[in-house]
């Protein structure tokens, strides 16, 4: 398939808010991919690069696009050719790697038309937002392959990713999907929680009685044991076994020889309170001297679910049964603190105790719900005390899908008194109602300092917005080295001027907290 065809599908999918039309267009494209293009094509349509980032930043990409020659006629780029080029770029390393990546990128863009360039730019930066979430794409794979959507979703859950499932479904049908099952030693995508405003809302949503567990501000881990073989995986399914010898020892000491457990690893202070998230994450760096760092910064594992225990796979079993299996496998001090209640007052006290002890909050869980790997299920509801900052809007991006036609993805910055400017801390389109999107689009158009037909529109830094977020993390992507975690807009502060916004020093203070 030509890249231009895939770029047009992406544009058309972004242009329609209708789920069924998105599915139909995606299914048609998936069905036309050559066998060796199916996995990568599915990845791209999901907005992902199969191998992750390719080492090209926004500044390099912008310069390459500006230097690209005018469009010219000739043979179009194929999906396979572009995939090979991106893999070559990602593989470049060593002295002069930046210049070598730029040469490869220039050669690729020289053969691409403008729609293809826009598609590639969004793909490389991880910003291809076309309203084709994984659920929509899974339904499209099912439609293209003539298979039940539930079977495709379950296979993707167990595979930890949709692209290999798409390739198997399109190439082999039901027989291909049958290969995907939970195997000890191979990670599955973790179940995630939706958000509730408070524990009262969480209990109501879950039908009264629920289990409440501390939400630790640590690193999510999935620990597998098969005899003496132990493997530990991160939330992103990266093998981190070598980084966590404490977890390996705990699993080997368990009374059961076959286990798959879900939990958190966290660095604790001497008084038992948690270190900041970024301190825990020092143990998970890619260049890590574990023998030196582990004694200085030990990790403690706490588990809250069992996917395999007692000789059985437990994904489909109710939460209360999975907890009972976990309790038989792991001692109480290595399980998260837990309360089963239907009493809102008791639940509020449990939350306040967790917060007082430095934890993020609690997760409320439906006692009869299965483990929905890879899904942000309504059976788990997290309740946290959010932080807020007043930040300034520096730019905005045009939305896609339901947000098409609105400036929606806000670039947010903190005031820098030293320079008189602003330091970007991240982007978000979360938390905005349709009315807010319409209002801010009109205001941002009036403040634009660049062309309105560009994908990203810079604006005069005059609008102050109150932003809620869950934490602050280090990030080489932004000039200040910091980024907000899970930022969402609460409201615009029209009563505040840019000089009233929070400063980067305030943000650094929260980070060092």
From Swiss-Prot:
Coiled coil spans: none
GO biological process: cell division; DNA biosynthetic process; DNA recombination; DNA repair; DNA replication
Cofactor: Mg(2+)
Active site: 215
Xref: CDD domains: Adenylation_DNA_ligase_Arch_LigB, OBF_DNA_ligase_Arch_LigB
Highest taxon of source: Bacteria
Keywords for this protein: ATP-binding, Cell cycle, Cell division, DNA damage, DNA recombination, DNA repair, DNA replication, Ligase, Magnesium, Metal-binding, Nucleotide-binding
InterPro entries recorded: ATP-dep_DNA_ligase (IPR050191), DNA_ligae_ATP-dep_bac/arc (IPR022865), DNA_ligase_ATP-dep (IPR000977), DNA_ligase_ATP-dep_C (IPR012309), DNA_ligase_ATP-dep_cent (IPR012310), DNA_ligase_ATP-dep_CS (IPR016059), DNA_ligase_ATP-dep_N (IPR012308), DNA_ligase_N_sf (IPR036599)
Any GO MF annotation of the entry: DNA binding
Keyword Nucleotide-binding: yes
Record: residues binding ATP: 213, 220, 235, 264, 304, 376, 382
Catalytic reactions of this protein: ATP + (deoxyribonucleotide)n-3'-hydroxyl + 5'-phospho-(deoxyribonucleotide)m = (deoxyribonucleotide)n+m + AMP + diphosphate
Top-level EC class as recorded in UniProt: ligase
Family the entry assigns: Belongs to the ATP-dependent DNA ligase family.
Protein name from the UniProt record: Probable DNA ligase
Species the sequence originates in: Anaeromyxobacter dehalogenans (strain 2CP-C)
Gene: lig
């Amino acid at each position: 398939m030509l890249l231009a065809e895939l770029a047009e599908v992406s544009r058309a999918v972004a242009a329609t808010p209708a789920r069924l039309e998105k599915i139909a267009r995606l299914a048609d494209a998936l069905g036309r991919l050559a066998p060796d293009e199916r996995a990568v094509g599915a990845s791209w349509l999901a907005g992902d690069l199969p191998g992750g980032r390719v080492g090209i930043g926004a500044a390099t990409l912008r310069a390459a696009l500006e230097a690209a020659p005018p469009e010219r006629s000739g043979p179009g780029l194929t999906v396979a050719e572009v995939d090979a080029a991106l893999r070559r770029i990602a593989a470049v390393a060593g002295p002069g790697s930046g210049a070598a990546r730029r040469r490869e990128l220039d050669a690729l863009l020289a053969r691409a038309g403008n729609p293809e360039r826009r598609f590639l730019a969004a793909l490389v930066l991880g910003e291809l937002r076309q309203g084709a979430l994984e659920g929509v794409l899974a339904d499209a794979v099912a439609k293209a392959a003539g298979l039940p959507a539930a079977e495709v979703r379950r296979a993707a859950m167990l595979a930890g990713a949709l692209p290999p499932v798409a390739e198997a479904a399109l190439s082999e049908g039901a027989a291909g999907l049958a290969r995907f099952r939970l195997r000890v030693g191979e990670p599955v995508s973790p179940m995630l929680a939706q958000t509730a405003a408070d524990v009262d809302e969480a209990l109501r949503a879950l039908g009264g009685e629920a289990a409440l567990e501390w939400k630790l501000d640590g690193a999510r881990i999935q620990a597998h044991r098969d005899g003496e073989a132990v493997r530990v995986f991160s939330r992103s399914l990266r093998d981190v076994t070598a980084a966590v010898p404490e977890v390996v020892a705990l699993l080997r000491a368990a009374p059961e020889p076959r286990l798959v457990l879900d939990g958190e690893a966290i660095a604790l202070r001497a008084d038992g309170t948690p270190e900041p998230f970024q301190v825990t994450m020092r143990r998970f760096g890619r260049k890590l001297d574990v023998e030196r760092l582990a004694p200085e910064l030990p990790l403690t594992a706490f588990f809250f679910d069992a996917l395999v225990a007692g000789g059985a796979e437990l994904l489909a079993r109710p939460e209360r049964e999975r907890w009972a299996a976990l309790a038989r496998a792991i001692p109480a001090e290595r399980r998260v603190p837990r309360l089963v209640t239907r009493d809102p007052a008791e639940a509020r006290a449990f939350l306040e105790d967790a917060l007082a002890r430095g934890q993020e909050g609690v997760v409320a869980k439906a006692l009869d719900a299965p483990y929905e790997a890879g899904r942000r299920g309504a059976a788990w509801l997290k309740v946290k005390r959010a932080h807020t900052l007043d930040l300034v809007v520096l730019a905005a991006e045009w939305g896609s899908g339901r947000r098409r036609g609105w400036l929606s993805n806000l670039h947010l910055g903190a005031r820098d008194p030293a320079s008189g400017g602003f330091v970007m801390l991240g982007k978000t389109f979360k938390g905005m109602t349709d009315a807010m999107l319409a209002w801010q689009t009109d205001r941002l158009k009036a403040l634009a300092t660049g062309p309105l037909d560009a994908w990203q529109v810079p604006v005069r830094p005059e609008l102050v917005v109150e932003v809620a977020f869950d934490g602050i993390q280090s990030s080489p992507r932004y000039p200040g080295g910091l980024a907000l975690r899970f930022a969402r807009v609460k409201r615009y502060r029209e009563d505040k001027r840019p000089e009233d916004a929070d400063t980067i020093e305030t943000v650094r203070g929260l980070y060092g907290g």
